[in-house]
Regions:
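Extracellular/periplasmic carbohydrate-active domains that bind, remodel
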Residues: 1-445
């Protein structure tokens, strides 16, 4: 079944209600498509359902309301009642005082509000034509995350067989895509501008993200406890981390990570700017890290994270291209430690800080750098790599330029094996390895 909404009926009625009624009608008839016409349509929350495609036609714009209570979703149709166990009044709290993560794990929390939502749905899609847009309009919520973040653009819980394709998201008041416990997801040809995280995956399996263009205010691709994830052909630009990610069997290929960042992290805005939904504005700062490991306690991690391959990628003007710091001073790297990560066929330019690889004493991770060409920014004056609590570290076919520190590798522990093969440090007169005597210190990402 297909319902093509027309501009007149969307103008004459509440667009949220009209779109929701169309989705429900298609769902009742076994599935199909709801098409949104060209125009600017202000909405609160639309609940997507199984076997339904939301199709944004050319220049169709879904604009999020700036009234936070428009996102207080209530199932009125009786089609798919929300279980009481999925509801909570818990609000976001800072990590160092929160008692649990109910605000995040329960789909009907205030934190999980969104423009487009789905719970326990299968075979669903959001697709867009040229010029289609989901605009969160930086909706302010004084009870939201960090006391200013509003709803996500797309929020999916426990969904399977998902296609996200062809549209743009801008100014998302929290994550552009917040996906929890989802299976079999394909996201392709999506553009994300400003806002917060581009795609954030939590406990998701079998995910493909390809040919997407991220210029975000927070991490481009993020998440923990994910399995079987492929990211390819994407462009990633941010003031935070290109990828802040934890998972098992993860491949990142043919991507470009680059700075300086196009948009500021909204946390850096003044309280008045946040309250008034001011634009994020240009950043000009560098990307903190191309790849940052992520393993907080927002939920149990099912498998040991590892078998992560990052290959055939370019890193331009990122402060560092690897940040794994399990030393204990970063709350988002304290759950399960990382087993292994491989960087292969990487060209990195404008690097300003050492790669950090600091594992757990009880599980010493393994790092491989193969076919790497790295050029440091002028005045960086640092080692290539900081090491601690490591198993096997392999540097093979590596060329380094403008390396001005006293050593290639600085080690705080001597418990692992370092193998260096065919390493060419142009103009470098320091030593290959050096043991540190000072306490370990690392700027968090």
């Amino acid at each position: 079944m297909q319902i093509i909404l027309n501009a007149r009926e969307l103008c004459e009625t509440d667009p949220t209600e009209r779109i929701q009624n169309a989705v429900d009608t298609v769902f009742r008839h076994g599935g199909g498509e709801v098409a949104i016409p060209e125009g600017d349509w202000e909405i609160g929350t639309v609940r997507l359902r199984s076997n339904v495609t939301l199709h944004l036609l050319e220049n169709a714009h879904l604009l999020g309301s700036r009234e936070t209570e428009k996102y207080c979703y209530c199932e009125k149709s009786g089609l798919e009642p929300i279980a009481g166990t999925d509801c909570t009044d818990a609000l976001w709290e800072p990590w160092n005082v929160r008692k649990n993560y109910d605000f995040m794990s329960k789909p009907m929390s205030r934190w999980n509000r969104g423009l487009i939502r789905a719970v326990d749905a299968v075979n669903l899609a959001i697709i867009g034509e040229n010029g289609s847009l989901i605009d969160g309009r930086d909706c302010y919520d004084e009870l939201g995350e960090e006391y200013y973040r509003g709803p996500h653009a797309v929020n999916l819980h426990r969904c399977e067989n998902i296609l996200l394709k062809g549209y743009a998201v801008q100014n998302s008041a929290n994550w552009a895509h917040a996906l929890f416990d989802c299976r079999n997801l394909r996201a392709e040809n999506i553009t994300v501008r400003a806002g917060h995280d581009g795609i954030h995956l939590t406990s998701c399996d079998n995910v493909i993200i390809q040919n997407c263009d991220f210029r975000t205010g927070d991490d481009c691709v993020a998440g923990i406890d994910n399995r079987n994830v492929e990211v390819s052909g994407c462009r990633l630009n941010t003031a935070c981390s290109g990828m802040r990610f934890g998972g098992t069997n993860v491949t990142v290929s043919d991507c470009v990570f680059y700075g300086p960042a196009s948009y500021r992290f909204r946390g850096s805005l003044s309280a008045e700017e946040k309250k008034n939904s001011a634009p994020s504005g240009e950043s000009g700062g560098g990307m903190l890290s191309a790849f940052t490991y992520y393993a907080d306690f927002s939920r149990p991690i099912r498998e040991t994270p590892g078998n992560i391959l990052i290959c055939n990628c370019e890193f331009r003007n990122t402060d560092r291209f690897l940040h794994y710091n399990f030393s204990g001073n970063e709350p988002w790297q304290r759950n399960k430690p990382l087993d292994s990560v491989v960087f292969r066929n990487i060209r990195a330019e404008g690097i300003r800080l050492p790669l950090t690889f600091w594992g757990a004493a009880e599980q010493k991770g393994n790092l491989t750098l193969q076919n790497i060409r790295v050029s440091f920014a002028k005045g960086a004056d640092c080692a290539l790599l900081y090491l601690g609590n490591y198993g096997t570290v392999l540097l093979e076919h590596l060329t380094a330029e403008h390396l001005d520190g006293t050593c290639l590798i600085r080690k705080w522990t001597d418990d692992g094996v370092v193998r260096i093969r065919d390493c060419n440090c142009i103009g470098f007169d320091g030593v290959m390895e050096e043991s540190a005597t000072e306490p370990f210190a690392c700027r968090a990402c």
